[in-house]
Amino acid sequence: MDLKTAVFNAARDGKLRLLTKLLASKSKEEVSSLISEKTNGATPLLMAARYGHLDMVEFLLEQCSASIEVGGSVNFDGETIEGAPPLWAASAAGHLKVVQSLLNHGASVNNTTLTNSTPLRAACFDGHLEIVKYLVEHKADLEVSNRHGHTCLMISCYKGHKEIAQYLLEKGADVNRKSVKGNTALHDCAESGSLDIMKMLLMYCAKMEKDGYGMTPLLSASVTGHTNIVDFLTHHAQTSKTERINALELLGATFVDKKRDLLGALKYWKKAMNMRYSDRTNIISKPVPQTLIMAYDYAKEVNSAEELEGLIADPDEMRMQALLIRERILGPSHPDTSYYIRYRGAVYADSGNFKRCINLWKYALDMQQNNLDPLSPMTASSLLSFAELFSFMLQDRAKGLLGTTVTFDDLMGILCKSVLEIERAIKQTQCPADPLQLNKALSIILHLICLLEKVPCTLEQDHFKKQTIYRFLKLHPRGKNNFSPLHLAVDKNTTCVGRYPVCKFPSLQVTAILIECGADVNVRDSDDNSPLHIAALNNHPDIMNLLIKSGAHFDATNLHKQTASDLLDEKEIAKNLIQPINHTTLQCLAARVIVNHRIYYKGHIPEKLETFVSLHR
C-alpha cells in the first residue's frame, strides 16, 4: 500500500496515532501534498468529517493545514455525492461536534455540493435537528435551494421531519416557495403522506398552488395514494367540488394500478359518482370523449352508479377505466399517464397477451413523443422495452412456444419512431442532445435493425426498411466517443443496451445492411478510429473482410498511429486470417513514405489524393 492510501485510510478510520507516525518524518510540503491528495475522489479531511472523527479533523486542520473547503465524493445510502465539502458531510452524517469544530475553524456555512445542496439541507434531509439549529444560529441561509429549486423546508416536509419543518417556519422559511417544476412544500407533504406537517403549513398560510404539470397538492396525494391527505384536503375550504371529484377518481385509479386493490378503487369511484349527482339541479357529468381509443380496447368511462356497479364483474374493464381517468385528469404530458399505460401493457405481456401489450405501448410511445423533449429517458425506456419484447417473442416463436408472431409492420413501426426521435434531437440545435442518451438511442436502433433482419418481408417492405435506414444514416448521428452507427454495429459494447439481452454485437448482418444503405466505411471516431479499427479491437475477421471489400482503407492509422492490423489480438485467429499484404497497394506505400518523411504535399497533389494521404498520417 502506498503512503497516500495509508494516510487516507488512517484518516477515514480515525486512527490518529497511526497517521501521526506516517507523517512524523515528512517535511511540511510533503505533509501538505499528502493531505490535499484525493483517493476515490475524497480528501482525508472529508473522510474524517464524514465518519465523525473529531480528533482527526482537528489534527488535520491544526497540524497539517488541511483545506477546510475542498469538496469531494462521499457516499450516503448507496448514492455518491459529488463536490461535498467537509461541513456538508459532517452535517449529513449527524456529527454535531465535528460541525461545531469545522465552523469554529472558519468553514463556510453555505458552501454547497455540485448539485447546490447546502450543509443545512443535508442536515434537514436526515432529520438532524440539533445540527439544523446550530447551522441556522451560525447564519446558514434557509432559502438556498438545490439545482432543482428544492429548499430545506421542502425536503424536511418530504422526509416527514416535523420538528425541523416547524423550526424552519419559526425562523421565517418561505412557506410558498416554488421549485423549478413549480411544486411547493405542500406538494412534498402530499407526496410523502405527512399530514401533521401539512396542517402546520396551512397554519402558516400555505397556498394550494398548481405545479408545472397542473397538479395541486390534493392531486399529488391522489397519485401517490395517501388516503389520509386526500380525506383531509377533500374537506378543506380551499377545495372546490370538481377538485374533490377529480381527486377521488384519481385515487381510485391509483388503487387499481399501484395498490392493486379493485374494491378500494370502487369505493372511491362510488364516492365521486355520488358527488357528481348530489345536486340534481347541477349534475357534473364526465366529458364526452371525441374518439374511443383502440389501445384501451375502445372502452369509455362509466357515467352512472349503475354502470359503476357493472364493473365489479369485469376486472379488465376496471383497469381500462383507471387508464382513462388518469389520462383525463392528469393529461398526456404527466409522466404517470404514460407510465401506467406501459405498466398495464407489461402485465398483458406477462400473461401472453402480446397484442394488447404492443397496442398500449405504441399509444404510450406516441404520447411521450408528442409531449416530452427529444431523447427523454422515458421515451428511450419505451423504445428499449419494445426491442426486448420483440426479441423475446422471436426467440419463443423459434421454440414453437407462441402462436403470436412479430410482424414486420410492428417492428418497422418502432424503428420509424426511433429514427424520428433521432431526427427530433438533431433538429433541436439550441439544446444539443445528451451524448449518452443519443448513444443509447442509436444502440436501440441497431438492435431493432438486427431484429428486422430476422423477420421475413416482401420486396416492397424490404425497400421501405432500407429507405428508412438510409434516412437514418443521412442524419449523421454520433454516439459516445463520436461513434457512428457503423462503429456501434462492430462493437461488442453495443450488446449491453438494457437489462435483458436483445441482439449480440458485433453483428455481421447489421454491418452489411448499414453498408448497403450508404454507411461510410472510412468514417472516424474521436480517436480517429475507423469502423475497421473497432472491428479489429473486437477480433471479428468476417466483419473486417466485409469492410475491406466495401472500401475500408486497410492501413489507415488512428490518432495513436495504429492501423487496424496493429489492434488485432496476437492470440486470436483473426490475426492469421487478415493478411496486410493482400490489402496494401503501391499507392498506400507511397502515402506512408510521404507521411513518414514529412514531405509537404498540400497544394501539390489533387485534393482527392490529399485526403488519401491524410488517412496514413
UniProtKB/Swiss-Prot annotation:
The alphabetized UniProt keywords are: Acetylation, ANK repeat, Repeat, TPR repeat, Ubl conjugation pathway
The ANK repeats extend over 2-31, 40-70, 82-111, 115-144, 148-177, 181-210, 213-242, 481-523, 527-556
Cross-referenced Gene3D superfamilies:
Ankyrin repeat-containing domain (1.25.40.20), Tetratricopeptide repeat domain (1.25.40.10)
Q: Which GO terms describe its cellular component?
A: Cul2-RING ubiquitin ligase complex; cytosol; nucleoplasm; ubiquitin ligase complex
Q: What GO MF terms are annotated? A: ubiquitin-like ligase-substrate adaptor activity
Report which superkingdom the organism of origin falls in.
Eukaryota
- Repeat in keyword set: yes
Note the SMART domains from the entry. Answer: ANK
* Gene Ontology BP terms: proteasome-mediated ubiquitin-dependent protein catabolic process; protein ubiquitination; ubiquitin-dependent protein catabolic process via the C-end degron rule pathway
Ranges occupied by TPR repeats: 245-279, 338-371
Entry-annotated residues carrying N-acetylmethionine:
1
Q: In which pathway does it act?
A: Protein modification; protein ubiquitination
Functional note: Substrate-recognition component of a Cul2-RING (CRL2) E3 ubiquitin-protein ligase complex of the DesCEND (destruction via C-end degrons) pathway, which recognizes a C-degron located at the extreme C terminus of target proteins, leading to their ubiquitination and degradation. The C-degron recognized by the DesCEND pathway is usually a motif of less than ten residues and can be present in full-length proteins, truncated proteins or proteolytically cleaved forms.
Assembly and partners? Component of a CRL2 E3 ubiquitin-protein ligase complex, also named ECS (Elongin BC-CUL2/5-SOCS-box protein) complex, composed of CUL2, Elongin BC (ELOB and ELOC), RBX1 and substrate-specific adapter FEM1C.
Q: Name the family.
A: Belongs to the fem-1 family.
Q: What is known of its domains?
A: The first seven ANK repeats at the N-terminus (1-242) are essnetial for recognition of Lys/Arg-Xaa-Arg and -Lys/Arg-Xaa-Xaa-Arg C-degrons.
Protein name, per record: Protein fem-1 homolog C
What is the protein's species of origin? Bos taurus
